[in-house]
From Swiss-Prot:
Homodimer. Heterotetramer of two MnmE and two MnmG subunits. The lineage of its organism: Bacteria, Pseudomonadati, Pseudomonadota, Gammaproteobacteria, Alteromonadales. Its EC number is 3.6.-.-. The gene is mnmE. Its main location: cytoplasm. InterPro entries: G_TrmE, GTP-bd, GTP-bd_TrmE_N, GTPase_MnmE, MnmE_dom2, MnmE_helical, P-loop_NTPase, Small_GTP-bd. GO terms for molecular function: GTP binding; GTPase activity; metal ion binding. This is tRNA modification GTPase MnmE. Keywords: Cytoplasm, GTP-binding, Hydrolase, Magnesium, Metal-binding, Nucleotide-binding, Potassium, tRNA processing. GO terms for biological process: tRNA methylation; tRNA wobble uridine modification.
Amino acid sequence: MTTDTIVAQATAPGRGGVGIIRISGDKATNVAMAVLGHLPKPRYADYCYFKSASGQVIDQGIALFFKGPNSFTGEDVLELQGHGGQIVLDMLIKRVLEVEGIRIAKPGEFSEQAFMNDKLDLTQAEAIADLIDATSEQAAKSALQSLQGEFSKEVHELVDQVTHLRLYVEAAIDFPDEEVDFLSDGKIANALYKIIDKLIAVQASAKQGSIIREGMKVVIAGRPNAGKSSLLNALAGKESAIVTEIAGTTRDVLREHIHLDGMPLHIIDTAGLRDTTDTVEQIGIERAWNEINSADRVLFMVDGTTTTAVDPHDIWPDFINRLPTNLGVTVIRNKADLTGENLEMTEEKGYSVYRISAKTGLGVDELKQHLKSLMGYQSNLEGGFIARRRHLEALEIAASHLQLGKEQLEVYLAGELLAEELRMAQLALSEITGRFTSDDLLGKIFSSFCIGK
C-alpha cells in the first residue's frame, strides 16, 4: 500500500445542505495550511474560510483535524464541511489537488488505510459498506454489530482455540518420549470437539447474517394452473403476475423482492412444469429449472383439487427426484377454499406441508411465518451480525479441515496430519478478518466501496 495523501467527497454526490471533503495522509497538514491558512486544533470544530491559491474565498464552513493515529484511517485526517452544492465541492477538491502530493482516492481507500493501520479488521471494513447498503432495519443493526466487532470476536476466539490446540499437538509430536500419550489421552479430542461445536454455532449465525444481507431465494414451482402466480401476488401484496384459468399463462420467470419483518426475500414465480411442444413454453420451463437449481428453498405448489396426497414423492416423484440434493422443499396444497381442508401445517416424511388458498389469502400469513423461520428470524437481533458469502465459504473450508483432522486423530492417531489440518483451518479462519489475506482479495473487497469511504 502506498503512503499517498488522498482526497474525496465523503457525502453523496449532488445537491445537499452540507458537503464534506475528506483528506487523509501525512500531507493533510499541508492542505490545511494552503486552504485554511492555519492548522486547526485537533478534534475541535473550527469555523473558517476555504480559500483558493490567490486568496479568494471558495466557501466557508467547519474544518476538523484529526492527528494520526487517532483518526478513522490512522493517518492525519482533515475534513472540510461546507455547503452541499456540487459545483462548490468540485471547486474545493480541485483546490486541494493543487497541493503537491495529493491525489483522488480510489473506492474504499479510506477504509483500506484504516485496515492497513490496524484501526479495524476486514470484517469491520466490510461492515461499513454493508451498513451503508442496508435495505432494512435489521440489516442495519446487524451491520453495526459487525462494525463494532461482534463477528470478529467470534472468529478471533476460534482462531485462538485452533492455534492453541495446534501448538499442543505439535508439542506432543516434538516430545514423543513422554510417559503420557498426548494423542490418545482424550484432551486433544475434547478440545477439537469443542472447537467443532463452536464453529458450527458460528456458521449458523453467519448463515443467518448472510440471509439478512443478501436475502433468501425462494422459487415457486409446480404444474401449470396450480396457483403459483396467485401465491406470488399474495406474498408480494400486489398484482405482480397475470392470473387466469388458462394453464401455462406464466411462460417466463417473474421476480419480486419483499421484506418480511426486515428479512429480505427474493420470490421467483416460474412457468408451469410439464411436457410441451410449444417452443416458447419449453424455454420458460428450462429457465424455471435454472432458477430451481440455484434456489435456497422451493415452494412446491400442488392443486389440492387434483390429489389428496401430501407426500411429494407420491404427488410427483419425477419432480422431487430431479431436485438438487439438500434443497429444502415446502409442499403447498393450494385451493383449500375449494377442498375444505383445515388450514394446518403438518410434517410428512421430513417435508413441511401447508394448506392455503392463494386466491383468498387463507393460510398465507402462516406460510410467511414459516419463511421467516427458515431465514432464522428473531424478533430481537441485537446480537446478530452481517456475513458475506466469502465468510461462509471460509467457515466451510475451516470446518472441512477440522473434520479431516478429527478423522486423522480418531482413526489413525496421526498427529502430524492433524496439525496440518489445524493449520489449514487456522488460515481459512484468519482470512475472514484479514489476518492472512491475499492482495487480490483485498483489492476486490475495497473496490466495491463508495469513493469517500
